[in-house]
């Protein structure tokens, strides 16, 4: 269970293996360069917007930064927990015959965290907000260093939580325990909101200390903030190895139960399109992380809106939010990250437009079902709140 150099070397081998699977390496390099350039632009350009670095709006942005830091941590935790410990460098079934250690999986999940679109958008939001709040001064450099380190800290902590939750979920009564824990956390949040204590709790989050140290300019206070973030990140990376090994020694009960179910054979589809739709539909609804993600997307925004006293006229943003989240959750995976499915689909004698049409149909079904669940849950919660 040691943090060995072999695990680090294995991560390098697997990353190079993934990079060489790209059909067009030149395009892959251009995409990476565009992502880095976009990140740099987001981190600098808002500082030159009129009103940046001074005025009421910039001050309001800086005031909300501690909550934004905590929100990024929450998003990172939810994404990692829902995905069952993070994205794999190599799929579990393909990695079975190879001596890939859980430490390698842990480090690989950390490196692949930016592949998550929710992670990337939240990171850009933090960088852009910091640039607007601080303005075009040299303090922007020190502030962005603190923000970048916080991205590393939050991602490392999220992986520790995700591997721990996965180890608990794979225990004998882990699924029931996880559901009880989720219900307890939800009930606690509702109680805090009912007692008007949610905002005071958010105002006391420890990220306030980090934000103050980041905007203080180059000083001993800033150096201490950077040192604390580096120490927390290193400790989280090392600590995450232990729950990763614990989870690896236990069977994924919910995934294995779904994969081992016996299903009656259905009649052959009438066309290639129907066959592909059936295959894609099964791949979505028989994947446990996709089910978890659907519930989070369908129920989460409505509960957050109710807890935050979002006006009813502003509820119209929720369908678009849920639809875009569902498109990112399933659509990006279906078209860009579906490595295992992409390997064998390319060998089928099917026209590319048929594959595209099938995935579009299944994506539309996924979004419609998610939005229907969201609408029902939001209306039910609203009636309960109004009755209370």
Regions found by a protein language model. Give the residues of each.
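Catalytic phosphate/nucleotide-handling subdomain of diverse soluble enzymes
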Residues: 345-347
């Amino acid at each position: 269970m040691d943090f060995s150099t072999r695990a680090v070397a294995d991560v390098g081998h697997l990353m190079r293996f993934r990079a060489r699977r790209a059909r067009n390496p030149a395009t892959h390099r251009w995409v990476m360069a565009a992502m880095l350039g976009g990140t740099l632009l987001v981190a600098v350009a808002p500082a030159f917007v009129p009103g940046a670095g001074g005025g009421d709006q910039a001050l309001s942005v800086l005031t909300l930064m501690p909550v934004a830091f905590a929100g990024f941590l929450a998003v990172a935790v939810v994404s990692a927990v829902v995905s069952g410990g993070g994205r794999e460098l190599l799929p579990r079934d393909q990695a079975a015959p190879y001596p890939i250690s859980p430490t390698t999986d842990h480090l690989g999940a950390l490196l692949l965290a930016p592949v998550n679109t929710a992670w990337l958008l939240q990171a850009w939001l933090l960088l852009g907000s910091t640039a607007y709040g601080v303005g075009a001064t040299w303090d922007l450099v020190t502030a962005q260093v603190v923000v970048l380190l916080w991205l590393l800290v939050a991602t490392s902590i999220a992986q520790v939580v995700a591997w721990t939750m996965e180890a608990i979920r794979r225990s004998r009564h882990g699924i029931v325990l996880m559901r009880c824990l989720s219900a307890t956390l939800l009930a606690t949040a509702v109680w805090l909101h009912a007692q008007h204590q949610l905002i005071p709790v958010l105002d006391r989050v420890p990220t306030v200390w980090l934000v103050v140290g980041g905007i203080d300019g180059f000083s001993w206070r800033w150096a201490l903030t950077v040192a604390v973030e580096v120490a927390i990140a290193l400790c989280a990376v090392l600590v995450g190895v232990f729950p990763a090994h614990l989870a690896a020694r236990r069977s994924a009960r919910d995934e294995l139960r779904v994969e081992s179910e016996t299903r009656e054979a259905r009649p052959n589809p009438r066309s290639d399109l129907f066959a592909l739709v059936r295959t894609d539909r099964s791949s979505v609804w028989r994947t446990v992380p996709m089910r978890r993600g659907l519930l989070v997307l369908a129920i989460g925004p409505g509960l957050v809106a109710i807890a935050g006293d979002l006006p009813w006229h502003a509820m119209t943003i929720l369908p678009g939010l849920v639809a875009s989240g569902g498109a990112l959750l399933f659509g990006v995976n279906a078209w860009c990250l579906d490595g295992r499915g992409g390997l064998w689909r390319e060998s089928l004698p099917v026209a590319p437009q048929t594959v595209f049409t099938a995935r579009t149909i299944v994506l539309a079904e996924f979004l419609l079902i998610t939005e229907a669940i969201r609408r029902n849950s939001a209306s039910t919660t609203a009636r309960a709140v109004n009755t209370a």
